[in-house]
Amino acid sequence: MEMFQGLLLWLLLGVAGVWASRGPLRPLCQPINATLAAEKEACPVCITFTTSICAGYCPSMKRVLPVILPPMPQRVCTYHELRFASVRLPGCPPGVDPMVSFPVALSCHCGPCRLSSTDCGGPRTQPLACDHPPLPDILFL
């Protein structure tokens, strides 16, 4: 009877593994279009623009016995290849640089979170917003 239960468990886990490997229920890490906002304190407007960012699921694991072993590094969806684009904020006073640069994702991968280039926080409940009045969307892809 124990052998039968072990065989049944092995078959169930095997089938579950095949089913799970067919594809994740969430989209994998990839470039997606997103609308972002740009403003500067001295400039009277906010510009929203559409660009590509990295977003999606990265497989992760958590140790069952974290007290005994050190924590496993968690990978995040981050830039693999990128280029930079810029927008000009209209109406900035003299002496204030009106240009705002931002990354455009060309490709993404799951890797360690580097605070120098990645927002490592979780999903946001509200989009980033501006304090100044917005101008119409600009498209950068």
Curated annotation (Swiss-Prot):
Signal peptide extent: 1-20
Q: List the disulfide bonds.
A: 29-77, 43-92, 46-130, 54-108, 58-110, 113-120
Where found? Secreted
Listed A to Z, the keywords are:
Disulfide bond, Glycoprotein, Hormone, Secreted, Signal
Q: Does the keyword Chaperone apply?
A: no
Annotated Gene Ontology cellular components are: cytoplasm; extracellular space
Q: Which GO terms describe its molecular function?
A: hormone activity
Q: Do you know which InterPro entries this protein is assigned to?
A: Cystine-knot_cytokine, Glyco_hormone_CN, Gonadotropin_bsu, Gonadotropin_bsu_CS
Give the quaternary structure: Heterodimer of a common alpha chain and a unique beta chain which confers biological specificity to thyrotropin, lutropin, follitropin and gonadotropin.
Source organism lineage? Eukaryota, Metazoa, Chordata, Craniata, Vertebrata
* SMART domains attached to this UniProt entry: GHB
Enumerate the Gene Ontology biological process terms: G protein-coupled receptor signaling pathway
Glycosylated residues in this chain: 33
Q: Which family does it belong to?
A: Belongs to the glycoprotein hormones subunit beta family.
Source taxon at top rank: Eukaryota
Reported function: Promotes spermatogenesis and ovulation by stimulating the testes and ovaries to synthesize steroids.
Give the protein's recorded name: Lutropin subunit beta
